[in-house]
Amino acid sequence: MAAWCSPRWLRVAVGTPRLPAAAGRGVQQPQGGVVATSLCRKLCVSAFGLSMGAHGPRALLTLRPGVRLTGTKSFPFVCTTSFHTSASLAKDDYYQILGVPRNASQKDIKKAYYQLAKKYHPDTNKDDPKAKEKFSQLAEAYEVLSDEVKRKQYDAYGSAGFDPGTSSSGQGYWRGGPSVDPEELFRKIFGEFSSSPFGDFQNVFDQPQEYIMELTFNQAAKGVNKEFTVNIMDTCERCDGKGNEPGTKVQHCHYCGGSGMETINTGPFVMRSTCRRCGGRGSIITNPCVVCRGAGQAKQKKRVTIPVPAGVEDGQTVRMPVGKREIFVTFRVQKSPVFRRDGADIHSDLFISIAQAILGGTAKAQGLYETINVTIPAGIQTDQKIRLTGKGIPRINSYGYGDHYIHIKIRVPKRLSSRQQNLILSYAEDETDVEGTVNGVTHTSTGGRTMDSSAGSKDRREAGEDNEGFLSKLKKIFTS
């Protein structure tokens, strides 16, 4: 006896030495036979054609360690055959793969396949090397359990009932693994859910692509129409979505008569099932399009104009339709050197001089839409805010505009002329609310005097009576 074993097939040659010519005179040699499948280490001789005598069909033979053949004796023979190892040992239970009980309804089976196929689809699990295998197992399990004929055979015989070496099931068309492309089955089943509460087929299978768009502060605040290049799956322009090469024709599926469904007769039962030849399309593409490879869709570069709504914020995502697909666009808004944003309100700083802060006046400020003349009230303090109503950003989820808040910043000069220093020293002499000291001034109460050692003493004396008149006016303004 000799045996050759592969992962799924076992090839066995069993025999005894051929009878000598003298001993075998008048003895008819066996014509051969067929060894059928049996589990473990048992072989079952189903039929040996001629010369079996009283040893009828299905006589049991046992393979024991030591490569010895024992059991029912028969005429010398040599028989070589191959048989498939039991698929039930190599395959998981289809019900366990889909996570449904054995009495599950077709609706429950389809729903389970829907949810698991979404979870394990290779496009959404690119980092998982086992996702493709799991996805194929789901397709195989669903193909069997969704067909009542195949399901009955599976319940009766298990996976071995579908093997080509086993004819007891009465069906020999199933060959292990899904007979249709798992992707096609996925599209077909998910297409049936397009109007169901489980979601939209296109939103599940073709996940919307995400893009990042850079915007300036003003573009985000005012809105803009911006051109953008996207790569998106759309109808193949070469074959117009038909899948076949232009100038060629698709063949009518003779297996199902173009209906996409085939009829299976199993005794008293007549079942309708998806055509295994064309996958339910009703036609067969013999010359697929060289661009889309028969899918009818191909990735294309498209230049689209995206209307950016006024008031979008940094990190905000919007959904945009592009052809028959949708894309997600996330905005990245650059910081402005002038404005700071708080919702629909904007903030900016306005620098004014000491004289403007004390005496008041006007100043020009940069607004979001135009240059604004701001009225400065006398005596304004640093960091005090001036509110410009309705000069902010449009409210994206409601009506109206935000406000523009101007923060006052008083610019203190780092250098003074002699005249300016004398004026400030004279003003400091009359200050009454100073805590501490002022450089160059000995007393800061009314009637105080400046330090003789100060750099401005000589200049003040040289200034004469004209300066005294100006200082008197300035003091009256400051102390009034």
From Swiss-Prot:
Q: Name one Pfam family in it.
A: DnaJ
**What CDD domains does the database record attribute to this sequence?**
DnaJ, DnaJ_C, DnaJ_zf
Post-translational modification remark: Tyrosine phosphorylated.
Q: Which residues carry this modification: Phosphoserine?
A: 398
- Keywords of this protein's UniProt record, alphabetized? Acetylation, Apoptosis, Cell membrane, Chaperone, Cytoplasm, Membrane, Metal-binding, Methylation, Mitochondrion, Phosphoprotein, Postsynaptic cell membrane, Repeat, Synapse, Transit peptide, Zinc, Zinc-finger
Q: Where is this region: Disordered?
A: 437-468
Q: How does it sit in the membrane?
A: Peripheral membrane protein
Q: How does it assemble?
A: Interacts with JAK2, HSPA9B and IFN-gammaR2 chain. Interacts with Ras GTPase-activating protein 1 (RASA1). Isoform 2 interacts with MUSK (via the cytoplasmic domain).
Q: Under what name is this protein listed? A: DnaJ homolog subfamily A member 3, mitochondrial
From the UniProt record, report the name of the gene that encodes this protein. Answer: Dnaja3
